[in-house]
């Protein structure tokens, strides 16, 4: 099959022929119809992190059609339309059996620890696909996986409730765009920040009460902050919390080292929550939300051959929502 491949890390992606991965007894082969980009695509090429196995096919997210099934697979058949869950786990350890797959010692991410979705097809365990949400486009179906799952778990772990206030920093990125939509779906009053005026305007058009320039003192105090930027927004995120507020962090795209005043933490009665990806049951719940009409922000779509152009747009931070490859 043909795929985008990274032979060295750091390195450059190339498009070429790679062997078809074998289908194990409990695997399915999915013919990819659409795949979505994530920051992981950029990080792998920079060697941050360095993939454990090279060469590797990038791509965490995809939607497609089942093309083959393993001999022990009973829940899927050739022709089924599915979405790929990029959160990998063993499925049989105590944590997995208890529904806490994100704590599995073998937990991994598709497209980082094993070859991913920017290819003609991807082979994945039968538990890692769900039925494609009815009424959603292929592009939308490919776009909610990694970032949507991360945002959903963050808001659940922060116990966001209807009527509470939520601040989403760096709106326009994949996690932030998903958090905006999910927060609104959960009945919260949502605020956002961005460096870009156009993104602030888009956030308000999508339902945010207000959007403010990143890095400036915020005129509101909120119950929950969702932050995926790290160092550049850390101080303002903490400063935006009400007494007893919760700060959920999933990334450090702008820097991974921050300073924390412990007296501020305890006198503010704040909760700090580290979170990434989600469990299989949370992916099922998110998929049901998407099927019921949850907004999925798709910035633009490219042909598979246009992966370099899509990467350039992602690198420049020009997008609002997800960048998608049509296969």
Predicted segments with their positions:
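NAD(P)H dinucleotide-binding glycine-rich loop of Rossmann-like/cofactor-binding domains
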Residues: 31, 88-170
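Mid-domain Rossmann-like dinucleotide-binding core that forms the NAD(H)/NADP(H) cofactor-binding site
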Residues: 136-216
């Amino acid at each position: 099959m043909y795929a985008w491949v990274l032979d060295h890390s750091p390195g450059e992606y190339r498009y070429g022929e790679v062997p078809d991965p074998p289908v194990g007894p409990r695997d399915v082969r999915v013919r990819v119809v659409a795949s979505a980009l994530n920051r992981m695509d950029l990080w792998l090429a920079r060697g941050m992190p360095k993939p454990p196995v090279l060469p590797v096919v990038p791509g965490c997210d995809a939607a497609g059609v089942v093309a083959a099934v393993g001999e022990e697979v009973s829940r899927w058949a050739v022709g089924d339309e599915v979405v790929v869950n990029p959160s990998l786990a063993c499925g049989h350890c105590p944590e997995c059996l208890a529904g806490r797959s994100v704590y599995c010692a073998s937990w991994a991410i598709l497209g980082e620890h094993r070859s991913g979705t920017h290819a003609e097809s991807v082979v994945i365990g039968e538990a890692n696909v769900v039925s494609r949400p009815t009424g959603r486009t292929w592009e939308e179906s490919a776009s909610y996986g990694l970032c949507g799952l991360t945002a959903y778990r963050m808001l659940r772990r922060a116990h966001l409730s209807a009527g509470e206030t939520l601040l989403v920093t760096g709106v326009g990125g994949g996690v932030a765009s998903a958090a905006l939509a999910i927060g609104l779906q959960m009945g919260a009053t949502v605020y956002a920040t961005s460096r870009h005026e156009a993104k602030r305007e888009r956030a308000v058009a999508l339902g945010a009460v207000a959007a403010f320039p990143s890095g400036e003192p915020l005129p509101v105090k909120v119950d929950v902050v969702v932050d995926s930027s790290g160092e550049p927004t850390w101080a303002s995120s903490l400063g935006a919390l009400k007494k007893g507020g919760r700060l959920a962090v999933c990334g450090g795209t702008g820097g991974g080292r921050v300073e924390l005043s412990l007296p501020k933490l305890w006198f503010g009665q704040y909760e700090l929550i580290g979170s990434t990806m989600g469990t299989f049951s949370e992916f099922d719940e998110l998929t049901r939300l998407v099927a019921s009409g949850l907004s999925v922000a798709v910035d633009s779509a490219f042909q598979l051959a246009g992966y370099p152009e899509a990467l350039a747009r992602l690198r420049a931070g020009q997008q609002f929502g997800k960048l998608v490859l049509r296969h």
